[in-house]
């Protein structure tokens, strides 16, 4: 299609002619005899665009023409209408040629094969039609539907006369239906279009002329609204906005057809009405004025409203989040606090601010009406539904103030129980007439405060002090629960420093048993106990004032045990009666012994076991030993190498019997205080050939007076005497017991101390 400009206004939009092919008929439109094959366009300066339009098949075109051939109107009326509209088209038809897209840059060789259509302004301006292919296809389908409807409606009319269907789609301005006989004043239209340009309104209207042999003047008026235009109007209101004079021209028996596209595309309403036979004597009406659009709110007005809204909102006592929640309950649209904040800061888009402004105005008026007659603290107003005042209840509660007398009562309850149960908290709250949640929070905070004041430490002192026993040649006082320092001998202070784990074993500590005078030989005291005290005071192992102490410090993860080593120069040489302590394998041997002792019946006693072993039952009264007690020893030699077969059995009774029968465990007497005495009988070389182990789990039987093993019976003996004192009431393992081995010459004045490890 070759386009010529017959005016000084530049062409910017091109719309191809939908060609309806009929192989049997080829003719020209009567309106094309004036030789003007150009297109007259009057409009604004818009960007030139090519519009792709999908093609229709030949079968569809023939079916459409078949219906159009049945429509006939008066030729003179159509000619008068065509001349009044200044629509001049020239149509050259070629059979089987599909609809094509025409661009201004086409070569002249294509001009003969392209239908020529004259486009002109109809109440508006021809501008660039920016349609997607889907929208263009829909537009063609709608045009075909209107042609078919017009053909069916005029099937009873005269044939060989073409009918026109006026299709008007407007989403920007309510356009008035224009009768075909009304001329259009282009100059006045241009003036209106200039006004519209100042308002930034892109009004696009097109007149599509599809002349065929039998359809001499089929005219289509199409108005398309650009996407993104603010002033969109509802499509269903289009027909109601048509003037009465245009409605009078419609056939009473032929309803309009309204087709609305999907929401994804711009709204279009197409009303198909047949063109009436216009009498030639009809007078030319006046120019139709295009109604002006409502101007959207400008930026200054929005800025002023946002500022006013923020001030009034703060004055009413609402937060931005309260406004969003209230609007969601009132109008069904939930708005976040960020949205309200951006509106007040003018950070939203112009479109969104225009949408949000009326909602905020309505909410502000409702909020002011509610608070005008009542205060914000009126609960009836706060709880009334539908007023959007629920946001006030979301405010942070004030800090709870607790009176002094209640605080004192809570402190007293905290000292009694730092972590009460839910029932106890409820009881306290009822007594103090306070809320349960307040009491619960107070206890939580008080416990945290206690942790800050008295932080728990791994090296802290235990609640139970060391219970050391001091024995002397005088009658033994065994019930002293604290450190005994009443000995006239020189005291020795040893710091607990060496950590021991449960798997650690003390290496061999030997007291050489060689004869002869030697000052290098020392008596060794080995003790393992939990760090229940930082300083342990124990009596000296001899009367010598020159006592020395060797201590070392080390620390492990969270737990510290104690190893005490006291060395005292010996005043005389060691005899064969002295004790050699070999502690290698002490943990394994103790565990084996305890395993056998744990399987004893609960009603067993040391008296019964001693009687069964052949010992004199008169030495041990049953009342002095609790049920389940166990007493056993080891054979001479290293603890881990020369164990007796009887010890390996599960019967402690057999162990005691074997030890007693072999003479390695002589029990000589039992003093009046309940102390079991092991002493040297005559010149026996070895009194106790190995360390004596008392089961720590069962030594709790000595609750009143812990057992003290001393050699008081041989106070006047001439030979060397060795005493063994091993008492403990540990509850965990033999490693936490205190083993003391001592040796001296002369009178039996050697004393030892033991600890009670909790």
UniProtKB/Swiss-Prot annotation:
DNA-binding region: 395-454
CDD domains per the UniProt record, alphabetical: homeodomain (cd00086)
Induction and repression of expression: Up-regulated by notch1.
Residue ranges of every copy of the POU-specific domain listed in the record: 294-368
Region (Disordered): 1-43, 271-296, 377-398, 450-472, 534-573
Compositional bias of kind Low complexity: 455-472
A GO cellular component annotation in the UniProt record: transcription regulator complex
Transport keyword on record: no
GO BP annotations, alphabetical order: Notch signaling pathway; positive regulation of DNA-templated transcription; positive regulation of transcription by RNA polymerase II; radial glial cell differentiation; regulation of apoptotic process; regulation of transcription by RNA polymerase II
InterPro entries membership: HD, Homeobox_CS, Homeodomain-like_sf, Lambda_DNA-bd_dom_sf, POU, POU2F1_C, POU_dom, POU_domain_TF
Compositionally biased intervals (Polar residues): 1-10, 19-30, 275-285
Disulfide topology: none
Keyword Nucleotidyltransferase: no
Tissues where this protein is expressed: Expressed in oocytes (at protein level). Expressed in the tadpole brain (at protein level).
Keyword annotations from UniProtKB, A to Z: Activator, Cytoplasm, Developmental protein, DNA-binding, Homeobox, Nucleus, Transcription, Transcription regulation
Gene Ontology MF term list: DNA-binding transcription factor activity, RNA polymerase II-specific; RNA polymerase II cis-regulatory region sequence-specific DNA binding; sequence-specific DNA binding
Places the protein is found: Cytoplasm; Nucleus
Gene3D superfamilies with a match to the protein in the record: Homeodomain-like, lambda repressor-like DNA-binding domains
Database matches in Pfam families: Homeodomain, Pou, POU2F1_C
Entry comment, domain topic: The POU domain controls nuclear translocation.
Role this protein plays: Transcription factor that binds to the octamer motif (5'-ATTTGCAT-3') and activates the promoters of the genes of some small nuclear RNAs (snRNA) and histone H2B. In vitro does not bind to variant octamer sequences, such as the H2B octamer 5'-GTTTGCAT-3', although binding has been observed in vivo during early embryogenesis, suggesting that interactions between pou2f1 and other factors might be required for octamer-dependent H2B transcription. Acts downstream of Notch signaling during radial glia formation.
Family: Belongs to the POU transcription factor family. Class-2 subfamily.
Stated name of the protein: POU domain, class 2, transcription factor 1
């Amino acid at each position: 299609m070759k386009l010529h400009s017959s005016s000084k206004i530049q062409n910017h939009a091109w719309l191809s002619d939908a060609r309806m092919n009929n192989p049997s008929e080829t003719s020209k439109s009567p309106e094309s005899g004036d030789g003007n094959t150009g297109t007259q366009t009057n409009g604004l300066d818009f960007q030139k665009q090519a519009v792709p339009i999908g093609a229709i098949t030949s079968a569809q075109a023939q079916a459409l023409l078949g219906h159009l051939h049945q429509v006939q109107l008066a030729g003179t009326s159509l000619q008068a209408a065509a001349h009044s509209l200044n629509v001049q088209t020239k149509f050259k038809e070629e059979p089987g040629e599909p609809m094509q897209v025409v661009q201004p840059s086409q070569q002249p060789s294509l001009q003969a094969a392209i239908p020529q259509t004259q486009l002109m302004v109809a109440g508006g301006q021809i501008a660039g039609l920016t349609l997607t292919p889907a929208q263009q296809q829909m537009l063609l389908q709608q045009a075909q539907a209107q042609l078919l409807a017009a053909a069916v409606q005029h099937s009873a009319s005269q044939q060989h006369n073409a009918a026109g269907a006026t299709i008007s789609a407007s989403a920007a301005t309510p356009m008035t239906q224009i009768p075909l006989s009304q001329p259009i004043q282009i100059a006045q239209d241009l003036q209106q279009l200039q006004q519209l340009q100042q308002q930034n309104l892109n009004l696009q209207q097109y007149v599509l002329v599809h002349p065929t042999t039998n359809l001499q003047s089929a005219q289509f008026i199409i108005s398309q609204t650009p996407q993104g235009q603010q002033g969109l109007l509802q499509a269903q209101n289009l027909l109601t906005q048509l003037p009465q004079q245009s409605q009078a021209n419609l056939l009473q028996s032929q309803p309009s057809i309204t087709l609305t596209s999907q929401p994804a595309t711009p709204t279009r309403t197409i009303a198909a009405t047949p063109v009436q036979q216009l009498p030639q004597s009809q007078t030319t009406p006046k120019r139709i004025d295009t109604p002006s659009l409502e101007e959207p709110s400008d930026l200054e007005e929005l800025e002023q409203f946002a500022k006013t809204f923020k001030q009034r909102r703060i004055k009413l006592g609402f937060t931005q989040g309260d406004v969003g929640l209230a609007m969601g309950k009132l109008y069904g649209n939930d708005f976040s606090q960020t949205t309200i904040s951006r509106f007040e800061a003018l950070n939203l888009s112009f479109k969104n601010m225009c949408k949000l402004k009326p909602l905020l105005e309505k909410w502000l008026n409702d909020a002011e009406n509610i608070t005008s007659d009542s205060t914000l603290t009126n609960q009836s107003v706060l709880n009334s539904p539908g007023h959007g005042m629920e946001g006030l209840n979301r405010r942070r509660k004030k800090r709870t103030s607790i009176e002094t007398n209640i605080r004192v009562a809570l402190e007293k309850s905290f000292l009694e129980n730092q972590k009460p149960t839910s029932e106890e908290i409820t009881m306290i709250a009822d007594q103090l007439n306070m809320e349960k949640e307040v009491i619960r929070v107070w206890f939580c905070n008080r416990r945290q405060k206690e942790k800050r004041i008295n932080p728990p430490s791994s090296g802290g002192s235990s609640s139970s002090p060391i219970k050391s026993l001091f024995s002397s040649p005088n009658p033994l006082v065994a019930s002293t629960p604290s450190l005994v320092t009443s000995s006239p001998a020189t005291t020795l202070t040893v710091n607990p420093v060496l950590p021991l784990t449960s798997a650690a074993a003390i290496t061999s500590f030997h007291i050489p048993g060689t004869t002869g005078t030697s000052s290098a030989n020392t008596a060794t005291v080995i003790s393992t106990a939990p760090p229940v005290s930082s300083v342990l005071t124990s009596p000296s192992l001899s009367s010598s004032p020159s006592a020395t102490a060797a201590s070392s410090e080390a620390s492990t993860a969270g737990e510290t045990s104690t190893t005490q080593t006291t060395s005292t120069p010996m005043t005389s040489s060691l005899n064969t009666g002295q004790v050699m302590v070999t502690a290698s394998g002490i943990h394994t041997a103790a565990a084996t012994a305890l395993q056998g002792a744990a399987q004893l019946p609960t009603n067993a006693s040391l008296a019964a076991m001693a009687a069964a072993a052949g010992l004199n039952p008169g030495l041990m009264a049953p009342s002095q030993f609790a049920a389940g007690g166990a007493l056993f020893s080891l054979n001479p030699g290293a603890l881990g190498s020369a164990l007796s077969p009887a010890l390996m059995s599960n019967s402690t009774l057999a162990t005691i019997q074997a030890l007693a029968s072999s003479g390695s465990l002589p029990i000589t007497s039992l003093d009046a205080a309940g102390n079991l005495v092991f002493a040297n009988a005559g010149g026996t070389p070895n009194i106790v050939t190995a360390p004596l182990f008392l089961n720590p789990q069962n030594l709790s039987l000595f609750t009143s007076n812990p057992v003290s093993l001393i050699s008081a019976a041989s106070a006047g003996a001439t030979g060397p005497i060795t005493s063994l004192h091993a008492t403990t009431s540990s509850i965990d393992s033999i490693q936490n017991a205190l083993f003391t081995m001592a040796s001296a010459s002369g009178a039996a004045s050697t004393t030892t101390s033991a600890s009670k490890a909790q």
